[in-house]
Every structure is written in structure tokens, then in C-alpha cells.
Amino acid sequence: MKNVTITLLFIIQTFSVRSQTVPGSIMPLNSNEFRNRIAIRELIDSFAYYADRTKAQRQAALFVENGTLEIYQSEPDTSKPIIVLKGRKELEEAFKGLEKYNMTFHLNGQNSIKFGDDTTGTVQCLAHHIFFENGKRMLQTEAIRYYDTYTRQNNRWLFVKRKLIIDWEDKRLSTP
């Protein structure tokens, strides 16, 4: 019983919003910021989930009406995007392109969110795509970083802009 009590106290202390801090930050989170961070993380994870379930319309609806997705093969500060999509209709059509894969799996990793005049974030993702090429099952893996700008509309967080940077990619034969 003593171990259960100690464990519960540890969990309560760890997740107490009054004392919670952001890694690399000395500023404690207040409960409103804590809720907003969770809501933004749900937005980020919903984007990956809808990509994997090929729900292009729902994925596009995670953006503001005139939201933008820019795709880069190197740092945005030193290069131009290879693709720019603007507005939910363009985004939805582009997201339908994931239907060409037999399966996808996007695994979101670290993320950092900064609140201010603009709410921004950085997200890391490993994207896995299974497809067939010349009768052979292939796996394409991409290490992706997103530089995001978020806004809150009608009590819901949405993407204003996502800059998708492909850090590296690997394509190989896949054996189930």
C-alpha cells in the first residue's frame, strides 16, 4: 500500500500544472498554457493520423481556410520550396496523393511550441511509405521537420502555415 501511495504522489507531482515546466525552459506552465500545449499536440498528431488513414478532407480541415503548406528539401532560410499549397482545396487534393501508397505510418517525435504574437512550433516526424515498384514491395522512409504557425479559431487550434523540410530519405526493398 505504501508503494502505491508513493507512486500516486509521484504521478500527481509530475503532472501538476502549477509546477510543470517546459524542457529547456525555466518558466512554469500555467493551466491555460498546459491545455493549449495539449490541444496543439493533438492537432499535430491528428495531421499524421489523417495522413495514415488517407482522410484528405479531414487533414485539410486542420488548416485555416487559406492555410499554407510549403515543402522544402533543405533549410527554408537558404532555399525555395519545391511545392507550395495554399487553401484547403489545394491541400485536400495534394493529401489525396497519399492514396498511391499501400500503407503509410507517420510517427511524430519531439516538438517545441512557443507562445507569443504568433504561436509557432517545430515538430519532428518519421514518415514510412509502403508501395510496390516493379512487383516488389518497397519502403520509403523520410525524416521530416515541420516549422509550424498556429492560430486559435472558435476555440480550436489550426495550422496557419506548415513548412515541411525533408532532412533525408531512404528507399529500400521491404520484406514483410
What are these regions (language model features)?
Residues M1-P23:
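Bacterial Sec-dependent N-terminal signal peptides
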Residues Q20-N32, G97-P176:
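A beta-strand edge to alpha-helix "cap/lid" segment located at domain peripheries
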Residues Q20-R53, Q57, A61-E65:
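Short, low-complexity N-terminal intrinsically disordered segments enriched in polar/charged residues
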Residues E33-N36, K80, V84, L139:
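Alpha-helix initiation/capping motif
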Residues S46, E90-E93, R145:
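Alpha-helical elements of Rossmann-like donor-binding domains used by nucleotide-donor carbohydrate transfer enzymes
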Residues A56-L126:
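A solvent-exposed, acidic/Ser-Thr-rich amphipathic alpha-helical stretch
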